[in-house]
């Protein structure tokens, strides 16, 4: 009997080892990993540059607290601001913590309380980020949520215009909703959101927890659009599997986040910073990012060609290497079949298969497309769905 709370619907796969794009279970079966730790292992498993950086830091010091100046924090912060619209960084341990920090900063700076977010969004499971999340299933059973969070339909310009006022502290969104089904924001809607924030003195917060750190072929996904957020949040891929989160903000916000306003015991931990520094050194290389964009286009084209004739496939969409296959009904019965064929994928909402490779080769993309085509063809023929 497990001593763990049953908070996860775990797969029947026990991992023995992982390296690059391959996961090996305790029975010796190997899987091509298109889950990537849920958009965490952006450089694959145990990338040698990241592993070397961690090992070097382990031989120096592990933790001293944020009462000290920690040089490697400054190095990672400099990398983040050099590749984003931000000027200052607050380090924490997860995406939820980064989003909590963003929400606190928005309220503190503006003196306002209302925050606009969007249906099917996902921002975390703490009380503030749960309230920000636009999914009822995340709210269920927890009683009254924190007030003043407004959930609007994504890409509905009229609804956003009606909701905006001088009482709104921030608009918070993902440019591609990951947990919400790999749903991209409309560029015109994002531009309108940015303009409305400027007009009303609200902050634009872009949650890049899943879309950031090279996932879409840019350092951050908002950089595909003509907007500049006031606050950016990052986590997941930032540490290549070592827990780390970051909130990145513009210079005018600095005075609102002074000593004692917020903090994190483990935020900016030297081991996490070593992982983040090495990760960013690889991911922010222009050649790496260009390769992600090219492979993303290749992957989408292959999926469109292979799946276009299948009735059960409603849509194939994505940005860079954040890709979703939307099916007509629930995809849960399909996941074990795909796994049995040696490909690890996961869902995004009830009817989307989510694919999150990053350092894969075109040959591995071809292999994955063949497996997906085979399973979806069989499902299409036998009406498994």
Swiss-Prot record:
<dbReference type="InterPro" id="IPR004636">
    <property type="entry name" value="AcOrn/SuccOrn_fam"/>
</dbReference>
<dbReference type="Pfam" id="PF00202">
    <property type="entry name" value="Aminotran_3"/>
</dbReference>
<keyword id="KW-0032">Aminotransferase</keyword>
<protein>
    <recommendedName>
        <fullName>Acetylornithine aminotransferase</fullName>
        <ecNumber>2.6.1.11</ecNumber>
    </recommendedName>
</protein>
<feature type="binding site">
    <location>
        <begin position="95"/>
        <end position="96"/>
    </location>
    <ligand>
        <name>pyridoxal 5'-phosphate</name>
    </ligand>
</feature>
<comment type="subunit">
    <text>Homodimer.</text>
</comment>
<feature type="binding site">
    <location>
        <position position="264"/>
    </location>
    <ligand>
        <name>N(2)-acetyl-L-ornithine</name>
    </ligand>
</feature>
<keyword id="KW-0055">Arginine biosynthesis</keyword>
<feature type="binding site">
    <location>
        <position position="122"/>
    </location>
    <ligand>
        <name>pyridoxal 5'-phosphate</name>
    </ligand>
</feature>
<dbReference type="InterPro" id="IPR015421">
    <property type="entry name" value="PyrdxlP-dep_Trfase_major"/>
</dbReference>
<keyword id="KW-0663">Pyridoxal phosphate</keyword>
<dbReference type="InterPro" id="IPR005814">
    <property type="entry name" value="Aminotrans_3"/>
</dbReference>
<dbReference type="InterPro" id="IPR049704">
    <property type="entry name" value="Aminotrans_3_PPA_site"/>
</dbReference>
<keyword id="KW-0808">Transferase</keyword>
<feature type="modified residue" description="N6-(pyridoxal phosphate)lysine">
    <location>
        <position position="236"/>
    </location>
</feature>
<dbReference type="InterPro" id="IPR050103">
    <property type="entry name" value="Class-III_PLP-dep_AT"/>
</dbReference>
<dbReference type="GO" id="GO:0030170">
    <property type="term" value="F:pyridoxal phosphate binding"/>
</dbReference>
<comment type="pathway">
    <text>Amino-acid biosynthesis; L-arginine biosynthesis; N(2)-acetyl-L-ornithine from L-glutamate: step 4/4.</text>
</comment>
<dbReference type="InterPro" id="IPR015422">
    <property type="entry name" value="PyrdxlP-dep_Trfase_small"/>
</dbReference>
<dbReference type="GO" id="GO:0003992">
    <property type="term" value="F:N2-acetyl-L-ornithine:2-oxoglutarate 5-aminotransferase activity"/>
</dbReference>
<feature type="binding site">
    <location>
        <begin position="207"/>
        <end position="210"/>
    </location>
    <ligand>
        <name>pyridoxal 5'-phosphate</name>
    </ligand>
</feature>
<keyword id="KW-0028">Amino-acid biosynthesis</keyword>
<keyword id="KW-0963">Cytoplasm</keyword>
<dbReference type="GO" id="GO:0005737">
    <property type="term" value="C:cytoplasm"/>
</dbReference>
<feature type="binding site">
    <location>
        <position position="125"/>
    </location>
    <ligand>
        <name>N(2)-acetyl-L-ornithine</name>
    </ligand>
</feature>
<feature type="binding site">
    <location>
        <position position="265"/>
    </location>
    <ligand>
        <name>pyridoxal 5'-phosphate</name>
    </ligand>
</feature>
<dbReference type="GO" id="GO:0006526">
    <property type="term" value="P:L-arginine biosynthetic process"/>
</dbReference>
<dbReference type="GO" id="GO:0042802">
    <property type="term" value="F:identical protein binding"/>
</dbReference>
<dbReference type="InterPro" id="IPR015424">
    <property type="entry name" value="PyrdxlP-dep_Trfase"/>
</dbReference>
<comment type="similarity">
    <text>Belongs to the class-III pyridoxal-phosphate-dependent aminotransferase family. ArgD subfamily.</text>
</comment>
């Amino acid at each position: 009997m497990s001593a763990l709370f049953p908070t996860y619907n775990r797969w029947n796969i026990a991992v023995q080892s992982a390296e690059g794009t391959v996961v090996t279970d305790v029975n010796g079966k190997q899987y091509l990993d298109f889950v990537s730790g849920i958009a965490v292992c952006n450089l694959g498993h145990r990338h040698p540059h990241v592993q070397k950086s961690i090992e070097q830091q382990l031989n120096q010091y592990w933790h001293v607290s944020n009462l000290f100046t920690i040089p490697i924090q400054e190095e990672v912060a400099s990398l983040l601001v050099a590749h984003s619209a931000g000027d200052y960084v607050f380090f924490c341990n997860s995406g939820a913590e980064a989003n909590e920090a963003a929400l606190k900063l928005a309220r503190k700076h503006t003196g306002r309380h209302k925050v606009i977010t969007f249906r099917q969004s996902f921002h975390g499971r703490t009380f503030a980020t749960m309230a920000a999340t636009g999914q009822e299933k995340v709210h269920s059973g927890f009683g009254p949520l924190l007030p003043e969070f407004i959930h609007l339909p994504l890409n509905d310009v009229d609804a956003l215009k009606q909701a905006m006022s001088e009482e709104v502290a921030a608009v918070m969104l993902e440019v591609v909703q990951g947990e919400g089904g790999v749903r991209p924001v409309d560029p015109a809607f994002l531009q309108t959101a940015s303009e409305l924030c400027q007009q009303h003195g609200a902050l634009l917060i872009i949650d890049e927890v899943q879309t950031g750190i090279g996932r879409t072929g840019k350092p951050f996904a908002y950089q595909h659009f003509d907007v500049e957020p006031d606050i950016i949040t990052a986590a997941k891929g930032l540490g290549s599997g070592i827990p780390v989160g970051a909130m990145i903000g513009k210079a005018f916000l600095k005075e609102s986040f002074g000593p004692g306003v917020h903090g994190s015991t483990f935020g900016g931990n030297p081991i996490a910073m070593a992982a983040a520094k090495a990760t960013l050194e690889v991911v922010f290389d222009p050649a790496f990012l260009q390769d992600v964009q090219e492979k993303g286009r290749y992957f989408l084209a292959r999926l469109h060609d292979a799946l276009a004739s299948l009735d059960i496939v409603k849509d194939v969409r994505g940005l860079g290497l954040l890709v979703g296959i939307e099916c007509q009904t629930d995809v849960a019965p399909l996941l074990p079949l795909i796994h049995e064929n040696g490909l690890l994928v996961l869902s995004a909402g009830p009817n989307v298969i989510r694919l999150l490779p990053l350092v894969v080769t075109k040959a591995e993309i071809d292999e994955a497309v063949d497996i997906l085509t085979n399973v979806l063809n069989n499902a299409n023929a036998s009406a498994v769905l």
